[in-house]
Each structure stands twice: as C-alpha cells, then as structure tokens.
A protein has these predicted regions:
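Short, high-confidence coil segments that cap the C-terminus of an alpha-helix
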Residues: 51-53, 114-117, 139, 169
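Structural motif
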Residues: 57, 118-122, 143-145
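A generic short-segment signal for beta-strand/edge and adjacent turn/coil regions
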Residues: 26, 110-114, 141-145
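Switch II (G3) loop of P-loop NTPases
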Residues: 86-138
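A short, gly/pro- and small-residue-rich
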Residues: 133-144, 163
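Conserved Switch II/interswitch segment of TRAFAC-class P-loop GTPases
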Residues: 124-128, 139-157
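Short boundary/hinge segments that flank catalytic cores
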Residues: 1-84, 90-96, 101, 150-221
C-alpha cells in the first residue's frame, strides 16, 4: 500500500513512513530508516504546542504493526538532537485496565513524565482495548501506525474512524510501516545508494508522478 491508496481508503493524511529492509541494498537499510525518521520528525514539529511536555500518542489497531519500532526511532532521533524524550508503553509503564488510566483526563493522571520535553505514549492495540477519549483529546498528536504489507480490514477502518471521533480537535495521522523503498522515496526523496542508474530511475519515476497528477487535475478528479 502506498500513500495515495492509504489516504483514499482511510480518509486521513499519511504523515510519514518507515521502510522495510531491502535485500538488494542491505548495507543502506539503517541509513534509509534514519532518513525516513528525519522526515517524519520534521513533519511532526509544526503540531507541537508551546506547553510542555509535547504528548504524542502512538496507536495501532493490531499487535505487531510497529508502534514500538516507530516510537523508539523517534525517541532516538530527538535524543540525538539534545531533547529530553520520554517513552511510555502499556507493556511496562502503565496498565491500560487500571482505574487511573481509564479515568484519566491527561497523561499526568496516570504516569510520571519527569522533565521530558516530548513524551511518546505507546498504547495497547485498539482492537483489544480502546483508549479513553480524554487522553486522545488532550494530546498534541495522535499517530496511527499501519503496516503497508497488511490488508486494512473493515474492522481496522471502523476502529480508526472511532479514534478520529474521539480525538476531537487533536490531529490524527497515519504512519505507514514496512513500506517499499519507492513508496518511502515519495517522502524522503532518493534513498542511497546514489548511483547514476538509481538517479535516472528516480527522475523517471518522478516524471511519471508529475504526469499522472497533471492528468488528474485536468480531469477534475
């Protein structure tokens, strides 16, 4: 699944991606992930408020979609920039069935955040347990992690739409995990290795995208 299809199916914007490992370009897998994470982190910044900490809820409909994977990369990226970042997970730092969580109005009602400037909160799979509406509304951002190589079902969409309703005015975006490299390059630009042949292929693909967008605009679609 790519950005265009994901946005058409879900009705929400895809803010970023994380690429799957490439056998062909194995030496560059880590670099590709770091580039993708830089682009995602940069896309998140405009939604940060002035109040601290900035709270970002990391969500998914199913287990194994990559919530912790994305959250850990985000944390490491910002920490390398000198920011204090907290990472809280339903697996260790809080109990999603506890009274303090279920009745919480904001993050500090059920977790200690210390002096963190940014707090990433990884919640339980939403097909198992929902997140209380006040926690979605009080955050700066809600990110739904979805695997690009897994079929998005009717149940996934129903859960996603419910989260959108619960979020109120808090922005809700998709982040696609395990994307193909060509899909990733729609967000990052050309990924390494930067050979002459790959540069030529990339320019060719961009010309194809431009032509397709022009045709859509002319037809009014």
């Amino acid at each position: 699944r790519d950005r265009i299809r994901a946005e058409r199916i879900t009705g929400r914007k895809v803010l970023g991606v994380m690429p799957r490992n490439s056998r062909r370009y194995r030496p560059f897998n880590q670099q590709a992930k770091e580039i993708a994470m830089h682009c995602l982190a940069k896309a998140l910044v405009p939604y940060f408020g002035r109040e601290k900490p900035v709270v970002i809820n990391i969500l998914s409909t199913e287990e194994g979609d990559g919530k912790h994977f994305v959250a850990q990369y985000l944390r490491d990226y910002w920490q390398k920039s000198g920011l204090k970042v907290g990472l809280l997970s339903y697996r260790e730092e809080f109990n999603c069935r506890s009274e303090s969580y279920l009745l919480a109005n904001n993050l500090t009602d059920y977790c200690q955040v210390g002096d963190a400037m940014i707090v990433l909160v990884v919640h339980q799979p939403l097909t198992e347990e929902s997140v209380p509406s006040p926690l979605l509304e009080s955050a700066n951002l809600n990110l739904m992690i979805a695997r690009s190589d897994r079929t998005w079902t009717t149940i996934d969409q129903e859960v996603f739409e419910k989260v959108g309703e619960q979020s109120g005015e808090t922005p809700l975006f998709l982040v696609l995990n395990q994307t193909a490299w060509d899909v990733t390059e729609d967000f990052t630009g050309l990924l390494p290795p930067y050979s002459r042949f790959r540069r030529w292929l990339y320019r060719l693909s961009q010309l194809g995208l431009t032509a397709r967008d022009t045709k859509k605009n002319e037809s009014g679609v």
